[in-house]
Amino acid sequence: YTTLFRSERKNPGYVANRQFPGQGAWKDIKAKLSGMSPLEQVKAVNVLINRWPYRTDMDVWGVMDYWETPVEFFQKSGDCEDFAIAKYFALRDLGFPASQMRIVVLKDTLRNLDHAVTAVYLDGDAWILDNLSNAVLSHKRLSHYRPQFSVNEEYRWAHLTPSAPKKTGR
């Protein structure tokens, strides 16, 4: 992921003339979004990026796991972490600070699969942008998601599950 962040700085995916199917140029989309509240911007970005088709890394790159830059995502589409990355950088381009966002790799306990989402911290809550849904939900409503680690441009975090203390004998 560090290579991804460096690459995005050198060749940004969100350039003024980037075309979004059925939506026009990024500069025009960005102008429309600028009049919205931060949460409305988050919701609009989630819906916009979710229009791309889901494609596995094996189908696109011939490898099990590859984190795409937004430029690569817009050219080929991708899987869950690629959607999360594209959303993260769209929000960065809209002015959201890195400190308010994370790309979260998690375990979906309902489907028993690894998954990735974008988390945005607003108004004391973490809002989850997911390629599986156009609805942006509070993390509190997604108890089947167990975060494993998360990253942004500045930091990385390991998420640990607390365990009950073990009783010991005398």
Spans of features found by a protein language model:
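Short, small-residue-biased leader/transition segments that mark boundaries at the very start
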Residues: Y1-L4
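Secondary-structure boundary elements
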Residues: Q19-F73
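Short leucine-rich amphipathic alpha-helices used at interfaces
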Residues: D65-Y66, V71-E72, S77-D79, L122, ...
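Active-site nucleophilic cysteine motif
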Residues: K76-K87, L91
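His-Asp-centered catalytic microenvironments across diverse enzyme cores
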Residues: D125-R170
